[in-house]
A protein has these predicted regions:
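Alpha/beta-hydrolase
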Residues: 167-168, 174-254, 273
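Alpha/beta-hydrolase fold catalytic core
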Residues: 13, 17-51, 73-76, 309-321
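Conserved loop-alpha-helix segment in the C-terminal half of the alpha/beta-hydrolase fold
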Residues: 246-288
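Flexible "cap/lid" loop of the alpha/beta hydrolase fold
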Residues: 145-185
């Protein structure tokens, strides 16, 4: 019976190949010759101008859904994309897949699958790191780049994380250290400090958190996150711990927006430094946190729209260096 059902499904699939079937913008993109597939969705009419790279690693596209209330109304279409192992995409149980290099080339396969060229690449947090990597390897396909809430090296990231943790009380710091030394990052007392005092101050400064962000957390692939980053936003033990692209930023020539929240997890001085090193860039610091698309929403979306419109209209001007 299973074999018969599989044959029927394959016949239906073959018959539908040429059909003009509406999917609400969703499209699965095959990777590695069809071994895996990743989910994408176009929002707004064709042609879409932006491909979005979500954060994490392992944090699905859902938290970016607020873009739908701002970009299409300004005539800007974009693509969601859940990276392999995340959200609506295939989730293979293979830790060897969770590397920067493989994800960088995955983005290139997605670009080809969507038929994109001279497009704007948006990356938030880990997506910003991935955007930098893609730009350094495949810049000829980019029209512009948006790096949101990401610095150019993990050493700088960790240094600022320690500065932010240093603002906690001595008792709270001692409690965190006790559990970190024991490798117990799930202890309720540890989580209470991280979520109640650290994340609430620097990840998203809203109570309650927006529904799309909460939904993304429920779908979070922590296996990928733990492999690549570590146990949380402030303890880096994963395989991108040595990542550093400060010396390579000058190679990014396309118009670039570097944007971050002043109250987030990235050092504002590092964001300004990135702007000085990327020759054709604009730097914006909003009043928000790491998820500034929510807690500094109007500022953030205004700057995203302004950048896209300037690039598309040939009006973009870089900051004076």
């Amino acid at each position: 019976m299973r074999m018969t059902f599989a044959i029927v499904l394959s016949l239906f699939a073959a018959a539908a190949l040429g059909a003009d079937v509406k999917t609400g913008g969703s499209k699965m993109i095959p990777l590695d010759g069809g071994k895996y597939s990743v989910w994408t969705k176009q929002v707004g009419p064709a042609p879409a101008k932006i491909l979005t790279l979500h954060g994490g690693p392992g944090f699905p596209h859902d938290y970016l859904e607020c873009f739908e209330d701002f970009l299409p109304q300004k005539g800007i279409s974009f693509y969601y994309y859940d990276q392999l192992g995340v959200g609506n995409s295939d989730n293979p149980d293979d830790a060897s897949l969770w590397t920067i290099d493989r994800y960088r080339e995955e983005v290139e396969q997605v670009r080809k699958g969507l038929g994109l060229d001279q497009f704007i690449l948006y990356g938030h947090s880990w997506g910003g790191m991935l955007g930098i990597e893609y730009a350094l390897a495949h810049q000829d396909h980019l029209k512009a780049l948006i790096i949101s809430d990401m610095t150019a090296g993990i050493d700088a990231y960790e240094a600022y994380a320690q500065k932010l943790l240093g603002e906690l009380s001595e008792a709270d710091r001692a409690t965190l250290k006790k559990y970190e030394d024991a490798g117990n990052y799930e202890a309720p007392e540890y989580q209470e400090i991280m979520m109640g005092k650290v994340y609430s101050a620097h990840l998203v400064r809203l109570d309650p958190w927006p529904e799309p962000a909460l939904r993304a957390f429920k779908k979070f692939n922590t296996k990928i996150y733990n492999t690549m980053q570590g146990p949380n936003e402030f303890v880096i033990t994963g395989n991108f711990k040595e990542w550093d692209r400060w010396n390579d930023l000058s190679r990014i020539k396309v118009p670039t927006l570097v944007i971050a929240g002043r109250l987030g997890t990235m050092n504002p001085d590092d964001i300004k430094r990135m702007g000085k090193l990327i020759p054709n860039s604009r730097v914006v610091l909003t009043s928000g946190s790491h998820l500034e698309m929510y807690d500094a929403q109007d500022e953030y979306m205004r700057e995203i729209v302004r950048f896209v419109k300037d690039v598309e209209g040939g009006r973009f001007r870089a900051d004076k260096k």
